[in-house]
Amino acid sequence: MFFSLYERRQSLLHRAPPVAKVASFALLLLCCNAQSWCMHASLTLVLLALTLIVTRSLKCVAAHIRVVSIYLAFFFSLKILHTFFSTGVVSATQINQHIHAGYHIGIRLFLLLCASSLFYACTSRLELFSLCLRMGKVLHVRSTAYTTPCAVYVMMLVLYFGHDIFREWTELRFVWRARTRANTSFYNWVDATLHFSKTLLTRLLERAQHPSLRRADFKVSDNILSSE
C-alpha cells in the first residue's frame, strides 16, 4: 500500500522544506472540498505528478485505486439492493443516479487518500499518525509496515463519513430511546436496534446520492416513530 512511501520516508523527512508540508496540507484541504469536474481533474493531475516526484513510483496510487474500487463495488451493491427492496424495480435512471453519486464519492475518496499519503510522506511528527501506531500496538500487530497503512485508511474513512454518521446518530438515538422506553423486553430492544440500523443506513445512502443534502440540517420527523 504505502510501501513506496516508507522506502523514501526517512530521507524525505530530512530534506522536505516547510513549504512542502504546508502545500501537502493545503492539497488535503482542497481535496476535501473539491466539487467540480475541473477541480477533480486538476487535483488528480497535481497529485499524480507530486506522488511520482516524491516516491519515484505509483505503487501507492495503484493501492488507492484498488481500495476505492472495492468500496465502490460495495457502495453500488448496497444502493441497488436498497432500491430493489424499496421499489421492487431498478430502472436505468436510478442506475445512472447511483453511478453519478458513486463518481463523486469515489473521486473524492481517491483524492483524499492520495493527498493524505503525500502529507504523511512530508510530515515527521503528527498526532494522527502516532495514534495510528498506538492502534497497531493495541491490535498486537508487530509490523508497522502493515499496521499504519490500514489504520490511515480507516482514519480517512472515519473523517470522510464521520460528520454524517455523527449527525444521524444524534438525531436517531432519540427514536431508538422512544421505541425502547415503551417496552423494555429483549425482543423490543432488538427490534428497536434493527430499526435504528436500517433507518441510519437508509439516510446515509440518501445523503450519498444527493451531495447537496450533506449541508442540510435535518430533523427527525414524527412519522418515523409510526413507520411500523
UniProtKB/Swiss-Prot annotation:
The protein's name is Uncharacterized protein TP_0226
Question: What keywords would UniProt list here?
Answer: Cell membrane, Membrane, Transmembrane, Transmembrane helix
Compartments, record wording = Cell membrane
Q: Name one Pfam family in it.
A: CbiQ
Q: Which residues cross the membrane?
A: 37-54, 67-89, 104-126, 138-160
GO CC, one annotated term? plasma membrane
- Report the membrane topology from the UniProt record: Multi-pass membrane protein
Q: Which organism is it from?
A: Treponema pallidum (strain Nichols)
Membrane among keywords = yes
